Amino acid sequence: MRLRALLLMVAALLSGAAFVTPAAAQIEVDINAGAVKPLPIAIPVFSGSTRGAEIAQVITGNLERSGLFQPLNVAGVPDKLADVNVQPRFPDWQSTGAQALINGQVTVGADGGLRVDFRLWDVFSQQQLLGLQFSSTPDNWRRVAHKISDAVYERLTGEKGYFDTRVAFVAESGPKLNRIKRLAIMDQDGANPQYLTDGSYIVMTPRFSSTSQELTYMALRPTGSSIYLLNLETSRQETVGKFPGMVFAPRFSPDGSKVAFSVERNGNSDIYVMDLRSRATTRITTDPAIDTSPSFSPDGTKIVFNSDRGGQAQIYVMNTDGSGVRRISYGGGRYTTPVWSPRGDFIAFTKQTGGEFHIGVMRADGGDERLLTTSYLDEGPTWAPNGRVLMFFREGPSGNPRLWTVDITGRILRPAAYSGSASDPAWSPLLD
């Protein structure tokens, strides 16, 4: 199945002959302060096609799950917004308490293709904030809804959206002591889940390439462990080299040309980097300690990892050739699974202290550490492409791990849309 985008944005910021788009919005959402009170927003059914109700529903779900918006029940509003090019009757929408309004229209072509026009309005200033038009094939209507969600999110928060993305994860089933762990993938809102492996062997730690077209992951079989590359467009799968000992925790470099991973031999774990073209492999740590969980910086010049070389697991940063190692975490407890933000400003991690687990973030230099969650077991953070939201998995004493999301303030914590047992999430970049 082709996962490359089939959508085409055919017009951006429509001129809107009858409407005026202001230079600055009257309403905005401060994402960095956290959502104390979500913004009331009206998202009525898009006109023109039965598909319009489904598109509006997906947009509603996306914005509501972000925690920054409060979609309102507007089924009884007299203004039905039949024509996207006609200005809304704002008193009708003001009476709902909405501060923002999204309306849209779906046009179905002779070939079944869709054209979706939408507008974003400031209800009280009665000004248009945004107008876009998208075209897609009939089966990609959800992609249109995600792109509209991203556009609205960016216009009202000033940050890039993250809705037109996918999540790879480990789908778990069976008894706690004999789990079946299959590689799976889904849209970020839980739609279109599919298995990528058959469950005959255990998979762990999937990670996307920067193009979202490839995954790397660890497979554990009775004969040992291996790291695989899986092309999501062709379904071609290959092993990344042969190594003595346990191989685990793979991650792509930002340009996709390399994979960093750990190899454990005789109780010692070190980090290696493989060039995927030449298959040349370089060992970049040689300390007689456990060095693991490598993650590249967005510019590809550094790697963050965790190591117990200081006595217990802490976070370190080094150059990609292994030089310049420096410790950046100094708090009590154990730090594991560090991962660099796509923006380069924060590093997320798992912390174990006082019998509890936390998902936390710190600045890239180790400063401004903050713990965002507390639970029996929270682990495996992965960044949304805007670098302002994290997904992780949470597990209770009885097992049954679930996916959760939290923003970088820690104030917006909620279960992810996927309700099945799942661990080791990996968030893709924005799709093309």
UniProtKB/Swiss-Prot annotation:
Signal peptide interval: 1-25
GO biological process, one term: cell division
Subcellular location: Periplasm
InterPro entries (UniProt xref): 6-blade_b-propeller_TolB-like, PD40, Tol-Pal_TolB, TolB_N
One GO term describing the cellular component: periplasmic space
Keywords of the record: Cell cycle, Cell division, Periplasm, Signal
Pfam families: PD40, TolB_N
Family, similarity comment: Belongs to the TolB family.
Function, in words: Part of the Tol-Pal system, which plays a role in outer membrane invagination during cell division and is important for maintaining outer membrane integrity.
Assembly and interaction partners: The Tol-Pal system is composed of five core proteins: the inner membrane proteins TolA, TolQ and TolR, the periplasmic protein TolB and the outer membrane protein Pal. They form a network linking the inner and outer membranes and the peptidoglycan layer.
Name of the molecule in the record: Tol-Pal system protein TolB
